[in-house]
Swiss-Prot record:
Gene symbol of the encoding locus: rplX
Subunit structure: Part of the 50S ribosomal subunit.
GO molecular function: rRNA binding; structural constituent of ribosome
GO CC term, one of those recorded: ribonucleoprotein complex
InterPro entries: KOW, Rib_uL2_dom2, Ribosomal_uL24, Ribosomal_uL24_CS, Ribosomal_uL24_KOW, Translation_prot_SH3-like_sf
Provenance organism: Mycoplasma pneumoniae (strain ATCC 29342 / M129 / Subtype 1)
Any Pfam family hit: ribosomal_L24
Role played: One of two assembly initiator proteins, it binds directly to the 5'-end of the 23S rRNA, where it nucleates assembly of the 50S subunit. One of the proteins that surrounds the polypeptide exit tunnel on the outside of the subunit.
Record-given protein name: Large ribosomal subunit protein uL24
Membership in a protein family: Belongs to the universal ribosomal protein uL24 family.
Length: 111
């Protein structure tokens, strides 16, 4: 079961981006990786594509973009407690809406 989902605030706990934080843009469950906003930037060299009509809208040259990071290098960030949590989450039924909500196990704050 995956504890990190799209839209979660995460912190990098190992690697060259250690200590950096951002919001998860995309999860790739088959590869166990995630793309985090503003982290793990790589440079791609893109040519101008002349075959499509969208060629004018595409950026060309050196383009900075986010590369995937393994989920094992990420930890959820509890914004209320201002600390990282290693994914211990429990689901609690919300009495008003009758839906499950994700709660940090350590601080009992909702995500």
């Amino acid at each position: 079961m995956q504890r990190i989902k799209k839209g979660d605030k995460v912190v990098v706990i190992t690697g060259k981006n250690k200590g950096g934080s951002g919001i998860v843009l995309k999860i790739m469950p088959a590869r166990q990786q995630a793309i985090v906003e503003g982290l793990n930037k790589v440079t791609r060299h893109k040519k101008k594509d002349q075959t499509t009509k969208r060629a004018a809208k595409q950026s060309t040259g050196k383009v900075q973009q986010e590369a995937p990071i393994f989920l094992s290098k990420l930890a959820l960030f509890d914004q209320k407690a201002k600390q990282q949590t290693i994914g211990k989450i429990k689901y609690v039924m919300d009495p008003k809406t009758n839906k499950k909500t994700r709660v940090f196990k350590k601080s009992n704050n909702t995500l």
